C-alpha cells in the first residue's frame, strides 16, 4: 500500500509541475491570453483606420466635393471666378504663447 501511495504522490507532483510550470501550462495560458487581448486592441485600431480609408475612397469615387477639397487644400487650385481665402493664425499670438508654455514646462 505504501508504494502505491508514493507512486500516486509522485504522479500528482509531476502533474502539478506540468500544470503550473510546464509547456502549455497556466503561465503560458496567461501570457497568450494577454497577447490576444493586446492584438485585439491593435486590430480594432487598424479596422477603424481601414474603415476611414474605405469611406474616403468611396467619397473620392462617388462625389466631386472631396476631389475639389483636396485640390484646394493640397494643390492650391480654385475654380474659375472663385476666390479662396485661407485664414492663418496670428504669429504674434503664437510666439507670445510659446515662451510661457516653455517656462511652465521647465518649472
From Swiss-Prot:
Regions of this protein lying in the Cytoplasmic compartment: 1-3
Keywords: Cell cycle, Cell division, Cell inner membrane, Cell membrane, Coiled coil, Membrane, Transmembrane, Transmembrane helix
Gene3D superfamilies linked: 1.20.5.400
A GO biological process held by the record: FtsZ-dependent cytokinesis
Coiled-coil ranges per UniProt: 39-62
Membrane topology type: Single-pass type II membrane protein
Name of the protein: Cell division protein FtsB
Lineage of the species this protein comes from: Bacteria, Pseudomonadati, Pseudomonadota, Gammaproteobacteria, Enterobacterales
Amino acid at each position: 500500500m505504501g508504494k502505491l501511495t508514493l507512486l500516486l504522490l509522485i504522479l500528482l507532483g509531476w502533474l502539478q509541475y506540468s500544470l503550473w510550470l510546464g509547456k502549455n501550462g497556466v503561465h503560458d495560458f496567461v501570457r497568450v491570453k494577454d497577447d490576444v487581448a493586446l492584438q485585439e486592441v491593435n486590430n480594432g485600431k487598424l479596422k477603424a483606420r481601414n474603415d476611414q480609408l474605405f469611406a474616403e475612397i468611396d467619397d473620392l469615387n462617388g462625389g466631386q466635393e472631396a476631389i475639389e477639397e483636396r485640390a484646394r487644400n493640397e494643390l492650391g487650385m480654385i475654380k474659375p471666378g472663385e476666390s479662396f481665402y485661407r485664414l492663418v493664425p496670428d504669429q504674434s499670438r503664437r510666439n507670445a504663447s510659446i515662451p510661457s508654455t516653455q517656462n511652465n514646462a521647465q518649472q
